[in-house]
Amino acid sequence: LMHKILHTRHKRKIAYKHYKGKSKIGFLFFSGFNSDMMGTKAIRLYNWCKKNKYQCTLFDYSGHGKSSEKFIDSSITEWIEDSNEVLNKVTSAPQILIGSSMGGWIAIKIGLLNPKKTKGIITIAAAPDFTKRLWKNELSLKQKKDIIKNGFITIPSEYDNEGYIITKKNIDAGNKNLILTAKTLEIKHPLRLIHGDKDEAVSWKESLKIFNKCKSLNAELIIIKNGDHRLSNNKQLEKIILTSQSLFDEVKR
């Protein structure tokens, strides 16, 4: 898959793939933390869009995949900036924002920042405010001390043999971008929240929190029986595509 480079106003180079398509509405995909546009869900969405001639855009956050910067120097603040520029400089139609894990958090931030350019939002195993949850509930006192002392720690991950780097910078940036602290979320767009009931990484109750706080009257919480955090088996991918198709049909009118 050939990619292009977007030079952002923050002097970062963001790798992206854009299929122009023939549709009046496009899909913009936001990957998870430590993931990139070569992920299973991203590729599946892109191929499905191409088959149907729907506009589709994939990209890598800075510090991820083929984009510039080091992961350790990047945070959700930069990733939201990157996402915003991709939406406004690469895509040419109103978009359905579709975000996986941390990408669900970012998709909602982007929807809040761009209400006119957003047509709908789909989240898959959304991880809103996960940095706050990590700090509060998951890191030990020793891990917190190490982060404060060294600026980062590495924690083991079942998704990456080298583990995840958790930085002080990203914990702090997360606190500036929280969405669940507000009483209501000004999301008025159609919203589809897909989550597995067996998600060990992020409870489906996180999607329920978004569901309860959003202003949208057209919101659906879709719980996948026995679904894990990845939601990447064939049946689950099919469900994501079906949800994308029905939302597309609904908002294109």
For each of these PLM feature ranges, what is it?
Residues 97-99, 124:
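Short beta-strand immediately N-terminal to the catalytic nucleophile in serine-hydrolase-like folds
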Residues 42, 46-68:
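Conserved alpha/beta-hydrolase
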Residues 99-107:
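Gly/Ala-rich beta-loop-alpha elbow adjacent to hydrolase catalytic centers
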Residues 1-21:
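N-terminal cap/lid segment of alpha/beta-hydrolase-fold proteins
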Residues 117-223, 228-253:
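The alpha/beta-hydrolase serine catalytic core
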Residues 33-46, 205:
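The serine-hydrolase catalytic nucleophile loop
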Residues 24-32:
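Short beta-strand element of the alpha/beta-hydrolase
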Residues 65-90:
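Catalytic nucleophile-loop/oxyanion-hole region of alpha/beta-hydrolase
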